[in-house]
Structure formats: structure tokens, C-alpha cells
Amino acid sequence: MVSGVTYLKRGAVFGSGAFGTALACVLAKKCESVSVWHMNANEARVVNQKHENVYFLPGAPLPANLTFTADAEECAKGAEIVLFVIPTQFLRGFLQKNSHILRNHVVSRNVPVVMCSKGIERSSLLFPAQILEEFLPNYPIGVIAGPSFAIEVAKGMLTNVCTAAADIDMARKIQRIMTTSDGSFRCWATTDVIGCEIASAMKNVLAIASGALKGLGTENNARAALISRGLLEIRDLTLALGGTGEAVFGLPGLGDLLLTCSSELSRNFTVGMKLGKGISLEEIKRTSKAVAEGVATAEPLERLAKKHNVHLPICHEVYNVLYANGCAKRSFKKLNSCKLADEGLPALPRTSKM
């Protein structure tokens, strides 16, 4: 049993996709009741009747103390911790409509707020926690990041993640709330918030590259090289944006990159596999219920790297394949034909050569 964990009466989760549902299952072990906001009232009723999120996480029975609701205010009322797991590109719209609810029921009671969404907003090039900060200025916001496939989390399989906040005491507070007493979901605290957000976004783009390698017929050696060089790209952007780098070689960076780049449970990896086999992005979108996060992230990541003059060669080639009529085979040939260089682990970001 893990000592020092915190129990609450009520938790709230905004966002009912696979990961949001999985985190709600974790909270259900720590709270007397958990409410999950789902945008469709009819679907919320179906989930409550079946005790299973048949829309986004089938096969994982939901705890009896977990309920879905389409009423954002009902979800927030009385919550002692609030998690956000709304897709990044829809987060601002939700906050524009419902930020008053957060101010009335969350901020006024000094409730911990934790961002669990991953990606980069196209219009602003902001990360999810930065978007939330615009609506809750000067309010402490935490982040959860790390290797965590939703189905495994929901089923209580062993998972380790990081809780991050600018104030280490806040990160540790969230850590105590989210860590389960049986240790099946364990959190490690850090202050490298921007590092966690960058790693969470970039690993999805790099997973597309890894899947494309698989689709092209390569095996383990090539994937190991891609993960290693991809990790340096995460590090370079993290340092350029003011991160400490602590998260890069821990669970949010190396841990999540290893997981997402190596398993067909990752939607990003499977999208990459299809691209590597020559299937177009349009066809992938047409035949998929949910598009992988890395597809939406690759374009704003390309612009963010240029803005900060950081060279991200692998992520750049993913962008080319997705949005510039590129070809996976040509992109990897280009990457493997680059000028010979030292391995090196420079302390400062490499300057852009794009």
C-alpha cells in the first residue's frame, strides 16, 4: 500500500474521451463520487445505463460511483479536484462558454485544476495549460503527463506518470490526490510544466514517424534510432521555450515516447503505419472514428519550431508528409542522408537549418 495519499469526496473530469474516462476511473478510487462532462446528453445517459463508455473506451467497465453528465455546472459543483481532458483544438471554445462556471465553483473554492490534454493550439501556438491560464489568470494549474494508454489505466494496470506545477507543493498535492493506495496509478512530482506539455505534444508527432517506419517495412534498429533522435528534438524545443529539461528524460519525455512509438495501441503509431504503406491522410480520416492527436499537432509544431528557430528534422518531415504532399519513403531517405555529425548532447538547442 502507498502511504501519504489523499482522499476526496468529489472529483470532476471535463472531457469524456478514452483518456478522460480512464482518469475518471482513477479518481473514482480516490473520491466518493466522480462526475464526467460529456457534450451529448443522450450519449451520457447511455453510458450511465451501460456503466461503460461505449463511444470512446469500450471494454472497460465504469465504477459505480462514476457518472456522466452533459451539464458543465453540475459536473463542477462540489468538486475538490478538476481535470481537463478536452481535445486541445476544442478547449478554448469550451472555456469561452463555461469559464464563469469554473470561477464560481472552482476558483472561488481554491480547488486544484489539472490539465491533461495534449497538443498545440493551431491559432495561438499555445499549449493546453497556457490556454487555460488565459481564462483563469494567476490561478495555479497543474499538468499530468507520462506513458499511459487509456485502456490500461482504466483497467487498473500499473501506470506511472508525472504531476507538474510551477509550485512543487502544488505538484505534490496533485500527486497525493491522483496516486492510488494500491500503487496501480503512481505519480511523480516535477516543476517542469512546459517540458511536460512539449513532450506530451511532440511524442504524438514522433509516433507517427515511428509508425511510418514500421509501415515501410523497417524493424527495431530504425525505431530505436528514431526514438533516440526524437528525444533530442523534444529536449531542444523544451530548452528553447524555457523548460528545465527535467521532464525530457523522465516519464513525460522518454517514457511516453517509448510507449507511443512502439505500440499499435497508439492511434498516432497506427496512422503512421498507414502513411508508410502509402494510404493517404484523407483516406485515413475517412475510415477512422477519431483522428490521432499528432495529425493536428504537426502543423502548429512546425510553426512553433520556426518561430523559436529550433531545428526539428523528424517532426519537420512528418509535417511534410501530412501537409506538404510529402512521401514517407522520401522523407526517411532524406533524414538518413543528412550530413554526418557528432552524436553529442549539447546543453543548448541546435539552431534551425530549415
Curated annotation (Swiss-Prot):
Q: Name one GO cellular component term.
A: glycosome
One GO biological process term is: glycerol-3-phosphate catabolic process
For binding substrate, which residues are annotated in this chain's numbering?
118, 267-268
Instruction: Provide the alphabetized UniProt keywords.
Output: Glycosome, NAD, Oxidoreductase, Peroxisome
Which chemical reaction does it catalyze? sn-glycerol 3-phosphate + NAD(+) = dihydroxyacetone phosphate + NADH + H(+)
Q: Which InterPro entries match?
A: 6-PGluconate_DH-like_C_sf (IPR008927), 6PGD_dom2 (IPR013328), G3P_DH_NAD-dep (IPR006168), G3P_DH_NAD-dep_C (IPR006109), G3P_DH_NAD-dep_euk (IPR017751), G3P_DH_NAD-dep_N (IPR011128), NAD(P)-bd_dom_sf (IPR036291)
Q: What is its main location?
A: other
The EC designation for this entry is 1.1.1.8
Motif Microbody targeting signal at which residues? 352-354
One family name in Pfam for this protein: NAD_Gly3P_dh_N
The entry lists its GO molecular-function terms as:
glycerol-3-phosphate dehydrogenase (NAD+) activity; NAD binding; protein homodimerization activity
Location(s), subcellular: Glycosome
The record's active-site residues are 203
Q: Provide the residue positions that the database annotates as binding NAD(+).
A: 15-20, 90, 118, 150, 267, 293
Identify its protein family: Belongs to the NAD-dependent glycerol-3-phosphate dehydrogenase family.
Q: Which HAMAP family match?
A: NAD_Glyc3P_dehydrog
Protein name, per record? Glycerol-3-phosphate dehydrogenase [NAD(+)], glycosomal
What species is this protein from? Trypanosoma brucei rhodesiense
